Amino acid sequence: MTKTPHQDAVNEAVSNGSRKMFFPLILVTSLFFFWGFVHNLDPILIPHLRKAFNLSDLESSLIDSSVFIAYFAMALPAGYVMRKYGYKSGILIGLVLFGLGSILFVPAANSLQYMYFLGALFIIACGLTFLETAANPYVTILGPASTATRRLNFSQSFNGLAAYIAPAYIGPMILSGKNLTQAEMDGMNAPELHNYLLEEAASVKMPYLVLGLIILAVAVIIYFTAMPDIKDEDKEGADGASFTGALKSGKLRGGIIAQFFYVGAQVCVGSFFIKMATTAAGMGEDSAAKYLGFFGLAFMLGRFAGTFIMKYIDAQKLLLIYALINILLCVLVINGTGMIVVYGLIAIAFFMSIMFPTIFSMGIEDLGHNTKIGSSLIVMSIVGGALLPPVLGMISDKTGSIQNGYIVPLMCFVVIVFFAFARRKNRINNNAGE
C-alpha cells in the first residue's frame, strides 16, 4: 500500500501523542460495539414484529430495507460532513440520530403501527451511516498502512461481540415465546386482540429506550473530548478530491460491488436465522434466539481468528478461501434438515466475519485524498442489505420454503469469490513486477 501524506501525519501523531489519543480511540472503538448491537437486534425484531402484525416473510424483510436504504440515502451527506467539518462532527451527528431513533421505539410501540417502527429504524440507520462512514476509515489511518486491514478487523471484532450479546441477552426480553396461530388470533374479541398486540409491541420499549439514552450519553462524552482529526491532505489536495477521481480506482469499483453483495448475504443469513431455526429444526423462538447468540459468538470469534491468521495469510487469499467455504455451507443449509441447518448457519457466520472490513480496506486502498469519498461510496453499497433480503423473502413466500431462499446468499458469496480472486491475481502481478 502506498504511503500518503495522510498516513505520514497519522504515524507521527501516533508516535508523538499516543497517550492523548488513547481515550478517544477507546470511544471510537466503542462505536463498533454499539452499531453492532442495534444491528443484531434486527433479527429479533423481524420474527417479533412478524408475529405482532401478522406479516409475510416479504413484508417482514422491510425491516432490513428501511435500515439499509438509509445507508444509501445518507452516505454522501455523511461523507460531505466529514470532508467539511471532520470525523468528530460526523460521529456526533450519527450518535444523536442513533439515540433519537432508538427512543422513538416507545411511541411506535404505543401506536401499534408497523410503519412507525420502520420510520424509527430508518432514523437509527441514518445515524449508523454517519458512524460507519467516519469510524471505518478513521481506524484504517490511525496506524501503519501495512496493518490497516488487520487493525480494522480487530476494531470490527467488537461489532462481533455485540452480535453475541444482543440476541443472547436482549432477545429473550423482546421475544415473549407466545406463538398464537392465526386461528387463535381470529378467535379473540377486539379488546383481547388489542391487548395481545399491545403486549407484544411493548416488549421492545425498555431495551430501545435504555439504548437510546446510553448513545446520547456517549455523544455528550465525545463532544467534550478532544478527538484527533488528522488531515489527510493539504488544501490543494482536498480541492482535488472528486467522485470521478475516486471511481477511476478499479479497487474501489470492485469493493463497491463486492460490499453490496456481502452485506446482502450477511443480512439474509442473519435476519432469517430464527425463521430457519424454527422451521428446519423445529425449535421455539426463545431457543432460536439463544442459538442466534451463538451465531453472533461465531461471528466475533471469526473476526479475532481472522485478524490473527492474516499475519500469515494475505487478506485476499483468506477472503477467497472463506467465500468458497461459505458457498459449500449454503448448499448444506439449503438441502439439510434438523440441527445441521442451524450449525451450518453458525459456521457461515464464522467464515463471513472478516468479509466486511477486508473488502472495505481493499476498496479504499491507495485512494489518498479521495479516501473519504471512497468510504462514502462503499457505505452506499450497503444498500445491498435493503434490496436482497426481500428477494429471499419473496422466494420463501412463493415456494413455501425459507431454505430455498438461501440461494440468494449463496450467489452473493460467488460474487465475493470473483472479487477476491481478481484482487489476489492483481496483487501477485504487482509483486512480480517489482
Can you name each region flagged by the protein language model?
Residues 130-144, 353-368:
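Intracellular juxtamembrane helix-capping segments at the cytosolic ends
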Residues 42-46, 166-167, 171-175, 245-293:
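Extracytoplasmic gate region of multi-pass secondary transporters
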Residues 62-80, 293-305:
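Central cavity-lining transmembrane alpha-helices of secondary-active solute carriers
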Residues 23-53, 135-136, 170, 269-277:
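Extracytoplasmic
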Residues 96-111, 324-337:
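C-terminal ends and interior cores of transmembrane alpha-helices
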